[in-house]
UniProtKB/Swiss-Prot annotation:
Record bears the keyword Coiled coil: yes
Gene transcribed to yield this protein: 43
Family membership: Belongs to the P2likevirus tape measure protein family.
Highest taxon above the source species: Viruses
GO BP annotation list: viral tail assembly
Coiled-coil positions: 9-35
Protein name: Probable tape measure protein
Function: Serves as a base for tail tube protein polymerization and acts as a template for tail length determination.
InterPro entries: Phage_tape_meas
Length: 729
């Protein structure tokens, strides 16, 4: 009947395996990050160059359209284009087209001084855009209003007009967002009653602060006053007479305009404020200011030309100050910086690259007929070229990459298979050696995985380079489409395909040589690892000398078996002769039986005790010898192992002793020794230390392995007992 035998096996290499797995994952993660960064950088560069070319072409076309719209000379058009570029680079507008639109408005309204440089023009453009931003309007309406202010005498120059508009908006004159329209519509009327821009803006601000609906209502009231008083008449004269003024003189002053008319307006408003009776005052106001006075009501009495300018406060420099305030922030400065870089690229392409390409235009046109012929050939054989291009794109390149990667994977599989077969032999020889074979196998497998991850990174770089080349080709094709004739593009593409087809054998041959060189290099590395494993590790030495070890072990067990057999035969012969001796001494049978039983029992006890001691000593001696030999090899490997594998960021840091020694199984120990039952722990033990194994402690844990045998334990016991009894020990 088969009986179970319990065996406790000690071994733990999880920590080393996890450490190496983490290192492999870090290498792989770095490869993915490097690939992502390289792809992002390559894409950004390609997009930037493509956008620069497109913008250079667009800017040149926009400048030509602007010059045609303004009728500017080539020199003037150049200065205007440079000014527009500077304005955009400084962070103004959403595009160069916006700058061109602002420039057109200023030019058409006469706001660009004759002979102004690009810098001067740029300064005017920037102010126009700043004022438009303050007013919440577009540059076009702002330029129109400023131009009208200059034509009607509201301002001496564009800078003064900009200051007046900005200061008026800051004082609330643009309450209903009609300030630009008001100056554009009523500028002539303001001039007719002797008002300049500052005074007119001050009156608008006073009326709005007094309760007027909007700037248009205040301006319309002033317009009606000028028309009514200039026409004169009995009602006008009577109204002035009620205020103690001469109507005829007032009519003459308003008709004269200028400062005299302004003074007449001032006296009229002062006279209205002196009338105590509200009914009489409103009736007089309606007579002189028309029905708008009914809408203005008391707001009309707030108008005072003599203090209007003071109401605005400081006007000069208002536009410049507002612009500096708007652009004194990080966002605007960053925008200006990036646009400056972009404009530099565009200027280089438009001013250097495109003119050089223009010089090649005649030569390219000379080969137009040849390109047309080639284009016809391609058209006739389009199917063939499509097949070749499809094979190159869809089959060949992926196949080459897959072949290279698969070769590396196959190499890794071969090594893993070899290590697995070696580990199997180690398992059958000794369980302790199996644990360390797994450690070594895990180490090598991690190294193979790191190599595969590195190969993936390289493949990513290759793919990134291919994608960058493809994007570059697309950009170049778009560039040529925008500048050159279509046959030239067709010829370039056809030429590329023809070159690939014509030199395909060379390309394939060189590619195979490169991959063959890589494969030979990989095989050399793994051959070196195989030699190292067989000659410098405990499991490797067991594998290499397995036949000798097995033969010696077999001879030893045969000797033990023969010895046990002879002993059992002696026991049998003794038992056969025992009855005769018992019958001849019947009188002392009982005492003799007792003595014989006692002798047998004591002999078995002593024999079993000696057998146990012998087995324990034998196991201990073998274990110490094996552990010492393997630990010696492990010390050599730990000494020879570097602290870091790889170069730079593609490196893996290794611990000082990556391969732990055999776990302490009891007995003398010294140096770094791995102990611990629930988890591996490395401790440094001084000479003369003794380790007591867990299985020797009460309640110690372990792994129970059930081993079945068909041998008869009672027969084995009888033979062992007889052998021990008759042995000389």
């Amino acid at each position: 009947m088969a009986r179970p035998i319990q065996i406790t096996i000690m071994g733990d290499a999880d920590q080393l395996s996890e450490t190496l797995d983490q290192a492999s994952e870090e290498v792989s993660a770095f490869g993915e990050q490097a690939k992502g960064l390289a792809l992002a950088a390559g894409g950004a560069i390609a997009v930037g160059i493509g956008a620069g070319i497109a913008e250079a072409l667009e800017r040149e076309a926009g400048n030509d359209v602007l010059a045609a719209q303004l009728g500017a000379t080539p020199a003037e058009a150049k200065r205007l284009g440079e000014a527009a570029g500077e304005v955009y680079s400084a962070g103004y507008g959403e595009s160069v087209a916006d700058a061109n639109e602002a420039l057109k408005g200023l030019w058409q309204q006469g706001l660009v001084p004759a002979g102004a440089t690009a810098d001067d023009n740029g300064e005017h453009f920037e102010k126009a855009m700043d004022v438009a931003t303050v007013l919440g309007d577009e540059v076009g309406p702002t330029s129109n209003a400023v131009g009208q202010m200059l034509k009607t005498g509201m301002a001496k120059n564009a800078d003064e007009a900009f200051d007046i508009l900005v200061r008026g908006a800051q004082e609330g004159a643009n309450k209903s967002e009609d300030l630009l329209d008001t100056f554009n519509e009523y500028g002539v009327q303001f001039k007719g009653i002797g008002l300049d821009g500052k005074t007119a803006m001050g009156l608008l601000s006073q009326g709005l602060q007094g309760g007027a609906r909007d700037a248009d209502l205040v301006a319309d009231s002033l317009k009606e006053f000028g028309l009514i008083v200039r026409a004169g008449g009995d009602e006008v004269n009577a109204a002035y007479k009620s205020m103690g003024l001469n109507g005829a003189e007032m009519t003459k002053a308003i008709a004269q305009g200028g400062p005299v008319a302004k003074d007449a307006l001032d006296k009229t408003l002062d006279g209205l404020r002196k009338i105590k009776d509200p009914a009489e005052r409103i009736a007089t106001a309606v007579t002189l200011f028309g029905t708008q006075a009914e809408d203005m009501q008391d707001a009309l009495l707030k108008l005072d030309p003599s203090s209007a300018v003071e109401t605005l406060g400081k006007v000069d420099g208002a536009a410049k100050s507002a612009g500096e305030t708007m652009h004194d922030n990080a966002a605007t400065k960053i925008k200006a910086f990036t646009r400056g870089l972009q404009t530099g690229l565009v200027d280089f392409i438009g001013g250097t690259v495109l003119p050089i390409l223009e010089k090649f235009k005649p030569a390219l046109e000379g080969i137009g007929s040849t390109m047309a012929t080639v284009g016809g050939f391609v058209s006739e054989h389009s199917t063939t070229f499509k097949v070749v291009a499809g094979i190159i794109t869809a089959v060949l390149l992926p196949a080459l990459i897959q072949w290279g990667v698969q070769s590396t994977i196959n190499a890794g599989k071969a090594v893993v298979a070899w290590v697995t077969s070696s580990a199997t032999a180690v398992i059958e020889s000794t369980k302790q050696a199996l644990a360390h074979a797994k450690v070594v196998a895990g180490w090598i497998a991690s190294g193979v995985q790191a190599g595969l991850n590195a190969a993936k990174v390289v493949a990513g770089w290759v793919l990134m380079g291919a994608q960058s080349m493809i994007q570059g080709a697309r950009m170049a094709a778009a560039w040529l489409l925008a500048m050159g004739p279509i046959p030239l593009i067709i010829a370039a593409i056809v030429g590329l395909v023809v070159l690939i087809v014509a030199n395909w054998d060379k390309i394939w041959a060189y590619t195979k040589k490169v991959f063959q060189w890589l494969w030979d290099w990989v095989k050399k590395i793994f051959n070196w690892l195989e030699d190292l494993f067989l000659n410098f590790t405990g499991p490797g030495l067991l594998i290499k000398h397995w036949d000798k070890s097995r033969s010696a072990t077999k001879n030893t067990f045969n000797n033990v078996k023969n010895f046990a057999k002879d002993a059992l035969n002696a026991v049998v012969n003794f038992v056969k002769g025992l009855p005769g001796r018992i019958l001849s001494a019947a009188s002392s049978l009982l005492s003799a039986g007792k003595r014989i039983g006692g002798y047998v029992i004591d002999g078995i006890k002593n024999g079993l005790s000696k057998l146990g001691g012998f087995a324990s000593s034998l196991a201990s001696a073998v274990g110490r010898a094996a552990k010492g030999a393997i630990n010696g090899v492990i010390d050599l490997l730990n000494w020879a192992t570097p602290n870091k594998l790889g170069w730079g960021k593609l490196s893996i840091d290794l611990p000082d002793n990556p391969i732990p020694k055999i776990r302490a199984m009891g007995g003398p120990a010294s140096g770094w020794t791995r102990v611990g039952e629930r988890g591996p722990e490395d401790v440094f033990l001084p000479n003369g230390s003794t380790v007591r194994p867990n299985h020797a402690l009460s309640g110690s844990g372990g792994v129970t392995v059930n081993v079945q045998t068909n041998a008869d334990p009672f027969a084995i016991g009888r033979e062992v007992a007889w052998a021990l009894r008759t042995s000389p020990a």
